[in-house]
């Protein structure tokens, strides 16, 4: 849940609820990060790592980073980790799905950061991340801003190769 989502719920729905979000998946039958009733809630942040999850945020080189956007990873095997895909000879698809980006580290595919308070912020899927001029920008960040305009009914953002770089193009449908 985004910071704006937290504010909306606390302002418009219920002020005294312990709101939390998650990041996980059906493939792992679990959460990498999730809420914790015993920790404070900070708008837009997920409080904790999941039980048995050695979760971290990596930069492009596989180094651990704090307060900077990067890739959500799990550095060690975990209890509910799938061990293979059915009919995947030589585990090629399995390795490509989770272990291709960082050697022997599970790459979840979420663009995230760990904050100075120890919470996690999820910005969207990293496979929908654009990289113009070497600056990583999640499409969710663009959509979050575009959705603030009542005049816009729908939008889609793409990255286009242009002059040895990537440029961002936003298409909109007006109301």
Model segments located where?
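Conserved AMP-binding/adenylate-forming
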Residues: 1-119, 126-129, 142
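AMP-binding/adenylate-forming catalytic core of the ANL superfamily
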Residues: 78, 104-175
């Amino acid at each position: 849940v985004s910071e704006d989502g937290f504010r909306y719920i606390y302002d418009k729905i219920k002020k005294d609820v312990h709101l939390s979000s998650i990041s996980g998946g059906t493939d792992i039958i679990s959460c990498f990060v999730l809420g914790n009733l015993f920790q404070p809630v900070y708008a837009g942040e997920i409080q904790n790592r999941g039980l048995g999850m050695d979760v971290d945020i990596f930069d492009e080189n596989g180094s651990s980073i704090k307060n900077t956007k990067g890739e959500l990873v799990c550095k060690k095997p975990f209890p509910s980790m799938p061990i293979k895909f059915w009919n995947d000879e030589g585990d090629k698809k399995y390795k490509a799905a989770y272990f291709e980006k960082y050697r022997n580290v599970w790459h979840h595919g979420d663009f995230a950061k760990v904050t100075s308070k120890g919470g996690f912020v999820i910005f969207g899927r990293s496979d929908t991340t654009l990289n113009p001029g070497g600056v990583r920008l999640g499409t969710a960040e663009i959509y979050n801003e575009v959705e603030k305009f009542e005049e816009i009914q729908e939008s889609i953002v793409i990255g286009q190769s242009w002059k040895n770089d990537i440029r961002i193009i936003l298409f909109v449908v007006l109301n």
